[in-house]
Amino acid sequence: MDKIIIEGGQTRLEGEVVIEGAKNAVLPLLAASILPSKGKTILRNVPILSDVFTMNNVVRGLDIRVDFNEAANEITVDASGHILDEAPYEYVSQMRASIVVLGPILARNGHAKVSMPGGCTIGSRPINLHLKGLEAMGATITQKGGDITAQADRLQGAMIYMDFPSVGATQNLMMAATLADGVTTIENAAREPEIVDLAQFLNKMGARIRGAGTETLTITGVTHLRGVEHDVVQDRIEAGTFMVAAAMTSGNVLIRDAVWEHNRPLISKLMEMGVSVTEEEYGIRVQANTPKLKPVTVKTLPHPGFPTDMQAQFTALMAVVNGESTMVETVFENRFQHLEEMRRMGLQSEILRETAMIHGGRQLQGAPVMSTDLRASAALILTGIVAQGVTIVNNLVHLDRGYYQFHEKLAKLGATISRSSEV
């Protein structure tokens, strides 16, 4: 099993780092590439991540041709002709995001069968919003033996209110509605930048979607879609992770290609702490004098609130800021598992239901730790950079799902970090 080894203590990160295309954008884009019955789809700026390979295999399992040119960061999908209606269990079971193929397969074929998805073990993450929305559009849904089967000769436009602005459900229903009869309205829709990117992609294909980035989406169904070319939006979570890394280490880092608007909630909290964050021609520069930073209170919320996918990394920053900071996690339950590992490094914290109190500013010590999910992996690595001594981060399977060459990028900024496959 691979591990990352960090010699921490006095590292100050400096330089530039290039941000990849967004994992959370490319996965639904690949699912949407199932929809066109004519032409090829070409996705550019695709990150080389294990989740991308998994989704490629999910789509290939539908008898769709998928070619990944890793050297060019480009994927070509040809879904013209007949496609299968059952997603392969072998790959669906590996990744939660694979549930977003349900809507496109159903809309394209009138029948779809998808196994219950896998992925990070963060809370229950129910998929009931996906299923309720499809039922509102006329689908008959059955669940048996861990499989979800959906049937609808032709989906019908519907008015859908989502009890929670779920990103995955919004994506699934938006894609399904593009080929439905009539108009579908999704109220309390997710507003994340990845939703906007998906809507722009679908509209290029010939879909008629209005309101992306707002609480109300309106989709007028069409009879067919065609393949197009599209550049994947930059990864705001990777950008945010490097912003936090700079802030934790009294660093001075230019995050190239980072989009200010996509990172506004995080930037606001960094500035509240006393971090200097400025927009430059080629990206966002973050500079900090860590000992002078102030503690803050943060509450995770759906976009445009503070992103839950930055919670673990930001608690790592709180750990090195003098005073008591508070993190309230309102999106997912059971997402403080990384704090248990950070306690092995000397962190003092208390957790009461959805709230974590971080007593920051004490010198942390290197230790062997185990990553429990994708963002926890990044948080533990950042903590290892500032901790005194050697930190070994184990179980990197999660890290590889969402960060490309993470340790190499940190090393170029000055961290003493390496990756080893030795037992």
Curated annotation (Swiss-Prot):
Name the UniProt record assigns to this protein: UDP-N-acetylglucosamine 1-carboxyvinyltransferase 1
Compartment list: Cytoplasm
Modified residues (2-(S-cysteinyl)pyruvic acid O-phosphothioketal): C120
Positions annotated to bind phosphoenolpyruvate: K23, N24
Domain of life: Bacteria
Enzyme Commission number, as recorded: 2.5.1.7
CDD domains: UdpNAET
Biological process (GO), any one: peptidoglycan biosynthetic process
Class of the enzyme per the UniProt entry, highest EC level: transferase
Signal sequence, start to end: none
Alphabetically ordered keywords of this record: Cell cycle, Cell division, Cell shape, Cell wall biogenesis/degradation, Cytoplasm, Peptidoglycan synthesis, Pyruvate, Transferase
Keyword Transferase: yes
Classification via HAMAP family: MurA
